[in-house]
Amino acid sequence: MTIKDPLLDLNIVTETSGFYQGFSKFVTVGSKISIGALILWAVTQPETAGQVLKAVRSSIDSNTGPWYMYVMAFYILVCFGLAIWPATGKIRLGGEGSSPEFSNFSWFSMMFGAGIGIGMLTYATGEPIYHFSNNPDVIMGNATASSADNVRAAMKWSFLHWGFSAWGCYAIVGLALAFFSYSRGLPLTIRSGLTPLFGRALEGPLGHIVDIVSVIATILGVSVTLGYGVSQFASGVYNITGMGWLMDVDGDPTKIAMI
């Protein structure tokens, strides 16, 4: 059995001039249309969109919950394995002889800023409190909500979201992007990390779809994080200052506060 040579180039057609110069027009326009359609749907039919999205999320949570936890644990094992296995642990991202662009302090600052960011402001205490009243152990009947026997479960589920499992997920994606881009010389896209599986098939529609889905997932993920963070920030400022324009009669942040 022969091992194929690694793919060191990926021909992704990009625009040579105009507004989309240097970008794949198919991916850029496709992502804009998809996100724009989703936003338009949410604005024009908020109740229907909310019900459909909640139903989709509930279905995903109920059908893939155990799988999600196993995958997160697998990510941690893979990260530790890559670190301690000599063949991979000694690989220098960027190629032999390259040096880091930033100091260790700067790298750690960027990692925590991007990996935790605004969530650290309130979720450090807010999430354990939330899980103290409701978490999968409570739902399955293994713990009683808001009781002493639920403290351990509340912290367990908080650490699942913010501990090694979360960083393992971030590291897998980050390593894939960094290795295939800076060590293999491929474009800095999600599709590049899939070249060992699909090869040059990623130069066409398959690769475009992968990148479009990645863009949509990134935008939606960041939007949810910013939305929750800004909402909680506005609530905190209201509780401290009492400025009425920050909250409406239902106790939710006003549109002006969110903007």
Language-model-derived ranges and their functions:
Residues 2-147:
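N-terminal alpha-helical transmembrane segments of multi-pass membrane transport
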Residues 19-26, 30-43, 76-79, 116-120, ...:
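Helix-loop-helix module between adjacent transmembrane segments
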Residues 131-150, 232-255:
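Hydrophobic alpha-helical transmembrane segments and immediately flanking/interface helices
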